[in-house]
From Swiss-Prot:
Subcellular location per the Swiss-Prot or TrEMBL entry: Cytoplasm
Gene behind the chain: glyA
Assembly and oligomerization: Homodimer.
Class of the enzyme per the UniProt entry, highest EC level: transferase
Stated name of the protein: Serine hydroxymethyltransferase
Organism name: Campylobacter hominis (strain ATCC BAA-381 / DSM 21671 / CCUG 45161 / LMG 19568 / NCTC 13146 / CH001A)
PANTHER family: SERINE HYDROXYMETHYLTRANSFERASE (PTHR11680:SF50)
């Protein structure tokens, strides 16, 4: 009997129920992945006990000689991964990383130009309900009806707005982002260029997506999603002047003592990302997503932008009589988890939507390849083409569980 099972069986049992859900269902939420046992092992270590306010070699607390080495290792691996000169590995999340960037580069009230949330952006790119849209004067660009960014349109908006900072990057954009064009736009109006690569970072470091360096002044990311590490954030730059401002913005500006056990998890994750196997994984993520999208289009479904260049697709139901929420619920009943998502030309509320976002990273981590993704796409189509057929959903759920049992990801809940 484990310590947790003995002391708090309620939480132990719920954790194991979640393990069973992760094992039995097909996880296709684009922002989720399955991290490595080694990452979870170090995150559950005694490192959680240590306070380490400050940075390596410049701490406010004593006894930091070993955690200094851990954080410096994470920094060095991060720099090597992205090919940059400076990295801050302390942000507790991607959202905090983004707020840290704003704190370093602009002042409250300054203008920012980001991707509209309903067009594929993120809350932290200036949405009015988020701190980024409350502390700063936020303006937006979006996608055209073909689902793609029109860079000439972005340039026109930038000339009118004259932002201090432009945000490029997205949470639901299936096409490659042209950082070079964004830099031309930023330079034309004298703006800083900030790339949020949280979704595509795992592809970037494998050479499967253009690197935001040297085009961007600053880059942020999460460390989970396509990087497959622990939940957390990072900020990177090539300029020492910017690095100093970023460090001050994170500590003492936003955070106190960093989560040392998570920083260690980031270091372990980065070691995986630096391995030769990572390039193979990233290629497979893209290949799996492509056949997923191609198969759904063959079955008559509309994909935003007509396909994908990365790890996700957006399926539009604007021409259907059901919503993204309906589709998400039906698929979950069939053992497939996705999320409802707004699409270009959206007519429904953000709580209902007219689309779903579907990702390939997590199932690729389980070892699935094109054959499995083609099968899954056909099952998704079967469910959606008869969306109210609960008997069919139950039948497919059993088939999904059988497939999932052949690709075991974890044999226990705690490491």
């Amino acid at each position: 009997m484990s310590n947790l099972e003995n002391f708090d069986k309620e939480i132990f049992d719920l954790t194991n129920k979640e393990l069973q859900r992760q094992c039995d269902y097909l996880e296709m939420i684009a922002s989720e992945n399955f991290t490595y046992p080694e990452v979870m092992e170090v995150m559950g270590s005694i490192l959680t006990n240590k306070y380490a306010e400050g940075y390596p070699g410049k701490r406010y607390y004593g006894g930091c000689e070993f955690v200094d080495e851990i954080e410096q290792t994470a920094i060095d691996r991060c720099k090597k991964l992205f090919g940059c000169n400076f990295a801050n590995v302390q942000p507790n999340s991607g959202s905090q990383a983004n707020q840290g960037v704003y704190g370093a580069f602009i002042k409250p009230g300054d203008k920012i130009l980001g991707m509209d949330l309903s067009n594929g952006g993120h809350l932290t790119h200036g949405a009015k309900v988020n701190a980024s849209g409350k502390f700063y004067s936020s303006f937006f660009y979006g996608v055209e009806m073909d689902g793609r960014i029109d860079y000439n349109r972005v340039a026109d908006i930038a000339k009118i707005v004259k932002p201090k900072l432009i945000v490029c990057g997205a949470s639901a954009y299936p096409r490659e982002i042209d950082f070079a064009k964004f830099r031309e736009i930023a330079d034309s109006v004298g703006a800083f260029l900030f790339a949020d690569v949280a979704h595509i970072a795992g592809l970037v470091v494998a050479g499967e997506h253009t690197n935001p360096f040297p085009y961007c002044h600053v880059v942020s990311s999460t460390t989970h999603k396509t990087l497959r590490g622990p939940r957390g954030g990072i900020i990177m730059t090539n300029e020492e002047e910017f690095a100093k401002k970023i460090n001050s913005s994170i500590f003492p500006g936003m955070q106190g003592g960093p989560l040392v056990h998570v920083i260690a998890g980031k270091a372990v994750g980065f070691k995986h990302n630096l391995s030769p196997e990572w390039k193979t994984y990233a290629k497979q993520v893209k290949a799996n997503c492509k056949i997923l999208g191609d198969t759904l289009m063959k079955r008559g479904f509309d994909l935003v932008s007509g396909g994908t260049d990365n790890h996700l697709i957006l399926v539009s139901f604007l021409k259907k009589d059901y919503s993204g929420k309906d589709a998400s619920n039906a698929l979950e009943n069939a053992g497939i988890t996705v999320n409802k998502n707004t699409v270009p030309g959206e007519t429904r509320s953000p709580f209902v939507t007219s689309g779903i976002r579907v990702g390939s990273a997590a199932l690729t981590s389980r070892g699935m390849k094109e054959k499995e993704f083609e099968w899954i796409a056909n099952k998704i189509a079967d469910v959606l083409n008869d969306i109210n057929n609960t008997s069919l959903q139950s039948k497919i759920k059993a088939e999904v569980k059988e497939l999932a049992s052949k690709f075991i990801i974890y044999d226990k809940a705690m490491f």
